[in-house]
Amino acid sequence: EQLIPKKTISEDKEALEVALRISAQLGWTQIQDAGSPFGDFQLLQQINKEGNLDIRIQMYLGMDGSGHAEDGNSYTSTERNPVDTFLDEGPYLDDEHMLSSRGIKLYADGAIGSRGAAFLDKYNDYDTDGFLIFKKETTMPILLKALRNGIQIQTHAIGDRGNRITLDWYEEAFKEIDSVNRLIEKPRWRIEHSQNIQPEDQVRFKDMDIIASMQPSHAIGDLHFAGKRL
């Protein structure tokens, strides 16, 4: 902060307003943002109340590995974790359906390029098997409360170990909170990227009705180094 001053709330709000205006000028009618800082959501609520939200926005609240809102970015004075408030209150949708937040994004592991994706075996070109970002002791309470209160979950997982552990924890949560005690009987949670999955885990997506949210662009983006890494 000695070299680059910390942004102010008004600067962040102005940046969002400019981005919204440009997006509307380009013809965008809706944006989905997966893994938003909680502070951005608060500012968009304010912009919406002022009547300046020109496009529909659906946001997923981003979280770090310790179960806190991503970046700890909150513009209200409160000691309570924003994630806890969101989990208790359930999905947010304004009266005009312009701004909504129906879910939380978790992160199981890193990426292949940085060798952070969590694999069952070590990388071919480095002595590591990647790492896990989330922790079970902070993640499971989130999954259980999300099932009770109708909150969608999407989890970033790229390595086969990251995907397997995510499936394991989803399955454990589904067993503990059965369909009778869920706000949404069939929540259809997602695993984002789902890039490397062992054959025995593939059928589990179908059995648990989990969406394998894959992006074809990653096949191209990882093309030049995936062969060496794996």
What is each PLM-predicted segment?
Residues E1-T85, R102, L106-G162, S179-L183, ...:
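Divalent metal-binding segments
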Residues Q42-Q46, I165, W169, E200-R204:
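A short acidic, amphipathic alpha-helical/loop segment
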Residues I47-G51, E89-L99, K175, S179, ...:
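Acidic (Asp/Glu)-rich catalytic clusters
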Residues K105-A108, G116, Y170, F174, ...:
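Short, small-residue-rich loop/turn micro-motifs
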Residues G150, L167-D168, E172:
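Glycine-rich phosphate/ribose-binding loops and adjacent secondary-structure elements
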Residues E171, D178, Q198:
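N-terminal active-site wall of soluble small-molecule enzyme domains
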Residues N196-L230:
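Active-site-adjacent C-terminal substructures of enzyme catalytic domains
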